[in-house]
Amino acid sequence: MMVRPRAWAWLVLLCGMVATVPAVAGAQTPPHSFVAGHGQFLLDGKPFQVISGEMHYARIPRACWRDRLRMAKAMGLNAITTYVFWNWHEPEPGVYDFSGNRDVAEFVREAQREGLYVILRPGPYSCAEWDFGGFPAWLLKDPTMVVRSRDPKFLAAARAWLLRLGKELAPLQIGNGRPIIAVQVENEYGSYGDDHAYMEDIRRMLVDAGFTKAQLYTADGAKQVPRGSLPELPAVINFGPGEAQKSFATLKQLRQDGPMMSGEYWDGWFDHWGAPHTADDADQQAKDLDWMLRQGYSVSIYMFHGGTSFGWMNGANSNGKNYEPDVTSYDYNAPLDESGRPTPKYYRFREIIAKDTGVTPPPVPAVPPTMTAPTMLLAEGISLWKTLPAPTHSEQLLSMEALNQAYGYILYRTQLDGPVTGDLVIDTLHDYAQVYINGKLAGTMDRRLGQHELPLKIAAHHARLDILVENTGRVNFGPALPGEHAGIVGRVRLAGKPLMGWDIYPLPMLTPGDLRYSKQPCDGPCFYRATFTVTTTPKDTFLNTSALTKGEVWLNGRALGRFWNVGPQKTLYVPAPWLKPGRNEVVVFDLKGKSGQKIEGLDHPVLHAAVLRSPAE
């Protein structure tokens, strides 16, 4: 959808971006060079210390990009690092989207307008606590395809993607006078495999895509450099607090000629549902940053600004046994918090960078205050059971991907002959299920807790079995990655007998759709609608989800993200540009909804509430 210039100007003002900057488009810019040489990085032949910070345009409302970039410049950074998430741009094979919040080229141009260079991480694998590590779910439709391998089917899909991305971004390299100084090949492959031929395949794809006028490089943990690097490219290293000196010592042993750079210095961490909010060691981080800068080493702080994994885009961790889905917020304890506000860490890092570089940064921009939205009564609702689409019938169970579905929920329905008593067993559940007998909730199963069995006692001669499954976020890192099909993978058995003959209902819920709400009571899996009025200029706010159980929230048709009463996150960030003066609509889908619930507005986030380990109740 195109937005008129005046509308964009209004959105820009909401994020506090009022200064005028010179346009880049159409300007004649001389070519420059950025290469690794003589043990360091060279910009136009002169030594250059990269002081970068990571933030992802997909996790930030477009109207706020410029505001966040100015905050980066004011902290003393000279570059911005960003992933490009493949699934964000190619939702279906051969269907590409670089519009609106997906306009990565405009994000790069805006960085240049703010005097920042750009380090690009196009993958094709990203990680980043993003669903499936940035891979599109449709790769899993072919059960024989193996991602991150030399499988010809995977390589063909990755090549087509990178060639298309090159059309957007290759013109924006430093060799063309634009801001992209470096492009990463794959991502931390040494923590996954050691196939150097595969890494060469990815490097060749990037070259063929036109990324020849910026410095290619690889990134790994220090000990994994031999497995994930390429001898002809610089290798940068990723590590966390307290590991700087040891990690660089290892890199020096492996790459005596340098250059020395931390591609990810972890200045925080992410949170999992049902686990405590991650503690922060700002003192150690300040010491590490100071030490690296004084050595003359380059660094990219991960994250400078985390933002939000809006909608269904959070990932998960797994070592092949456990499953740990990530929360919606990607605050990360970063210098700039989830809503773009500087934290004490921001000012501490700013002081260190200024001291160690001798460069005084621009003043820190003023940030508009937050607001408290009025309390919203979820007075209108409709049961999920009244909104089901036409099913697909299959004797065998099918995954989401087999039905061309990427996110949301999927319902499996079959008829049972009873009476029967025994365990309902799901071979492989991805990821959370509510089980119903004749429309009545019989129990839940949670992959996070290793649950895949539920005792049932069915007295009726005929009964309807419904298994409502949520894709809680595909694993984004580790050996489980290739098998991250969503839904039920494998068989379902009851009392030892395989169940066959299923009606399967895809429920992607990318938007709530046009539903027929009523004021009749609605309990169980229900959609609810409420409205509230903004009487002043919209400002950032937060929705308190403490009264809700498990599900998703949309604001004016935009998916804000997930909620789950297991904690630790109990608010959802509402960016000011997504609010409208006047009437605003909130839609909630709650797996265990109750009529009459309320959502309170808050002027601050709640990301560290007490956690529950048990399933949602």
What spans do the regions from the language model cover?
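N-terminal carbohydrate-binding accessory modules
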Residues: 26-79, 109
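Active-site neighborhood of glycoside hydrolase catalytic domains
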Residues: 154-231
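Aromatic- and acidic-residue-enriched segments that line the glycan-binding/catalytic groove
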Residues: 94-102, 113, 123-149, 199-204, ...
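An active-site-proximal structural segment forming one wall of the substrate-binding cleft
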Residues: 103-120, 143-180
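Aromatic-lined substrate-binding rim segments of carbohydrate-active enzymes
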Residues: 65-131, 203-208
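Catalytic-core region of carbohydrate-active enzymes that cleave or remodel glycosidic bonds
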Residues: 208-209, 213, 242-337, 341, ...
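The substrate-binding groove and active-site-proximal loops of carbohydrate-active enzymes
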Residues: 50-61, 85-103, 140-160, 184-195, ...
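Aromatic-lined ligand-binding clefts that engage carbohydrates, nucleic acids, or primary amines
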Residues: 421-436, 465, 532-556, 563-564, ...
